[in-house]
């Protein structure tokens, strides 16, 4: 698990566009990004060490009665020295997942700054954002509504579709509905983009 970060952005060009959606998981260090990734992959809690580079996994998520949707998920390290490289990994992504530690309220202002910076980057404008308020299993964790308020999610660009979901990497709570909502937002954006092209 874990690879070194590079300036080269990941690409899904080797995959048919209908086969997998490219999603990047970012957030501050110790927010639980990698634990969430492997909870989705293996359906169990995996204790992880800080990601020094990135992890990537293909994850199939069941949606209703369909066969489900496949996400190619890139989990990128959140240490301060690695954050300038986030843009290389979010370029051309279908969706952003921003993970916060809801039990560590004192770092939410720092998380807010990073969320607004990455979502307003020229390459990411309009990209749907799912905020996962992780560690809901811990006492004192802030609710999704409180996290949404602290991060000023509604102040992101009006063209950016957003959703804040409480979750826990320990028991998997909230992950399925969160990813379903992300998928809906990605589809909505793609449909709007197609409609815009037809009007030209």
Swiss-Prot record:
Q: Which PANTHER family match?
A: ADP RIBOSYLATION FACTOR-RELATED (PTHR11711)
Entry's Gene Ontology molecular function annotations: GTP binding; GTPase activity
Q: Where is the lipid attached (N-myristoyl glycine)?
A: 2
What NCBIfam families would the database entry show?
Answer: small_GTP
Where does the chain bind GTP? Answer: 27-34, 75-79, 134-137
Q: Name one Pfam family in it.
A: Arf
Tell me the superkingdom of the source.
Eukaryota
* Compartment list: Nucleus, Nucleolus; Cell membrane; Nucleus; Cytoplasm
What family name appears in the similarity comment?
Answer: Belongs to the small GTPase superfamily. Arf family.
Task: Give the gene name.
Answer: ARL4D
Could you tell me what this protein is called?
Answer: ADP-ribosylation factor-like protein 4D
How is the quaternary structure described?
A: Interacts with CYTH2; the interaction is direct and ARL4D GTP-dependent. Does not interact with ARL4D.
The membrane spanning regions, by residue number, are none
Which residues lie in coiled coils? none
- Job description of the protein: Small GTP-binding protein which cycles between an inactive GDP-bound and an active GTP-bound form, and the rate of cycling is regulated by guanine nucleotide exchange factors (GEF) and GTPase-activating proteins (GAP). GTP-binding protein that does not act as an allosteric activator of the cholera toxin catalytic subunit. Recruits CYTH1, CYTH2, CYTH3 and CYTH4 to the plasma membrane in GDP-bound form.
Classification from the root reads: Eukaryota, Metazoa, Chordata, Craniata, Vertebrata
Keyword Hydrolase in the entry? The reply is no
- Keyword field: Cell membrane, Cytoplasm, GTP-binding, Lipoprotein, Membrane, Myristate, Nucleotide-binding, Nucleus
Any one GO CC term of this protein is: plasma membrane
Species assigned in the record = Bos taurus
């Amino acid at each position: 698990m874990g690879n070194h970060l590079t300036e080269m952005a990941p690409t899904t060009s080797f995959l048919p566009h209908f086969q997998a959606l490219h999603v990047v998981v970012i957030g501050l260090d110790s927010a639980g990004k990698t634990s969430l990734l492997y909870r989705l992959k293996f359906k169990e809690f995996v204790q992880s060490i800080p990601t020094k580079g990135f992890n990537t996994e293909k994850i199939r998520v069941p949606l209703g009665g369909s066969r489900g949707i496949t996400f190619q998920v890139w989990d990128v390290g959140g240490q301060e020295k690695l954050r300038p490289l986030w843009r290389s990994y979010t370029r051309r992504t279908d969706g952003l997942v921003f993970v916060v530690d809801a039990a560590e309220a004192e770092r939410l202002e720092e998380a807010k700054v990073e969320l607004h910076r990455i979502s307003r980057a020229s390459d990411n404008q309009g990209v749907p954002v799912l905020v996962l308020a992780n560690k809901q299993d811990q006492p004192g964790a802030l609710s999704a509504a409180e996290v949404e308020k602290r991060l000023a999610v509604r102040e992101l660009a009006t063209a950016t579709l957003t959703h804040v979901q409480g979750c826990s990497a320990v028991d998997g709570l909230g992950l399925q509905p969160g990813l379903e909502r992300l998928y809906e937002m990605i589809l909505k954006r793609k449909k709007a983009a197609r409609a815009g092209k037809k009007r030209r």
